[in-house]
Amino acid sequence: MQMVSIKNQGCVTQIIGPVLDIEFPNGQLPKVFNALKVKGPENIITCEVQQLLGDNRVRAVAMSSTEGLKRGIEVTDTGAPITVPVGIPTLGRIFNVLGEPVDNLGDIQSEDSLPIHRAAPSFTQLETKPSIFETGIKVVDLLAPYRKGGKIGLFGGAGVGKTVLIMELINNIAKAHGGVSVFGGVGERTREGNDLYEEMKESKVINADNLKESKVALVYGQMNEPPGARMRVGLTALTMAEYFRDINKQDVLLFIDNIFRFVQAGSEVSALLGRMPSAVGYQPTLATEMGTLQERITSTTDGSITSIQAVYVPADDLTDPAPATTFAHLDATTVLSRSLAAKGIYPAVDPLGSTSTMLQPSIVGSQHYSTAQQIKSTLQRYKELQDIIAILGLDELSEDDRLTVARARKIERFLSQPFFVAEVFTGSPGKYVSLEDSIKGFNMILGGELDDLPEQAFYLVGNIDEAISKAEKLK
């Protein structure tokens, strides 16, 4: 005889904004993190159990608006956490926190689904040997290389090229690593999310004609959504990425924009649940919540999840608990500079401000390390000389300093690169530059082999051979 599972039924006893208190029959309390379904006046609202209050009551946080709900409404325990679709059918689509498509392209035909709350991989599954994740972007690979399965913080204000850099990384991982990407918009502006989607379609990162050939799945929890949705949308994106790593055994890029909004939403939920706030009004569980998310982003023997997280720094205060807690998990930082963007040097990655724990001779090799250090010291010297040049002019510098400035300006321009996703706007074909070619090119500039070439020959080219042939044309 087939067993028929009877769902636990409860009823709402109190509503405080997005927080609901729900009473269940004796001995039938749902577990913490279980998804509950509440039948609202217009649609079914999903909540997640956050606390057990005693007296057969639980406190849950709603994932959508609680407008129209009243006491006494029936609640059903699903018996499991929020579960989302995963796999190839998710590519090219936009989802909300519950894994429901929000792009008006119909339902998802996915046979597989996973709960958003899962344990991090065990020690025995982890890939511990540090290896470089080649992006094909010169400035990143050479000066602040990414770790495979590492976490990278992307710092940059509005209009310096964060979105274009993100799209180029999505494009390059698909071409060079055969991997896919998942984009988690956490507390995003809806307009920005829509712009990103349209730009991805334009640059063919999302193939609108054949969605399965797309390279990215998008998960959005926008600014206007309740804090519960913004707090969990990062986990939804991560769960989709984990499937590609564990089942499809692929290298995955996970973008979280913005990790600060994840903390902010957690802080709102914490206050609504009545917890005593900690430093600067943040939740007392800040480090635990951040750790639970970050520990699942890692390399296993099957594949890797490399995460790039945009970090908003409130009031530019790096000691604020939110960015400070994030820094503890980062392997590299990519800082975008407005002054480089103003010069027209794209990607506008600050070569002196960006850092990486991977830039050690024991990991990247002595040649790569010494080239990177020489580039940094040349650019640093150029930076120190800029005030003198502004006041007295270039002619007042010593012969050595003039040579340093000339090489630094060539390096600065050679760090720029035409992007595949920007072909539509620039008209220049995109270039993927291998690390080997980057090192060779910069060593030639540093060694003085190319001192007679004009500096504009180095602007927006791929490898050094292109710069040399461009110089021939400029003559």
Curated annotation (Swiss-Prot):
Protein keywords: ATP synthesis, ATP-binding, CF(1), Chloroplast, Hydrogen ion transport, Ion transport, Membrane, Nucleotide-binding, Plastid, Thylakoid, Translocase, Transport
Alphabetical list of SUPFAM superfamilies matching this protein: C-terminal domain of alpha and beta subunits of F1 ATP synthase, N-terminal domain of alpha and beta subunits of F1 ATP synthase, P-loop containing nucleoside triphosphate hydrolases
A GO molecular-function annotation: ATP hydrolysis activity
Chain sites annotated for binding ATP: 156-163
UniProt organism field: Gracilaria tenuistipitata var. liui (Red alga)
UniProt subcellular location: Plastid, Chloroplast thylakoid membrane
Catalytic reaction annotation: ATP + H2O + 4 H(+)(in) = ADP + phosphate + 5 H(+)(out)
Principal location listed in the UniProt entry: plastid
Protein name: ATP synthase subunit beta, chloroplastic
GO cellular component entries: chloroplast thylakoid membrane; mitochondrion; proton-transporting ATP synthase complex
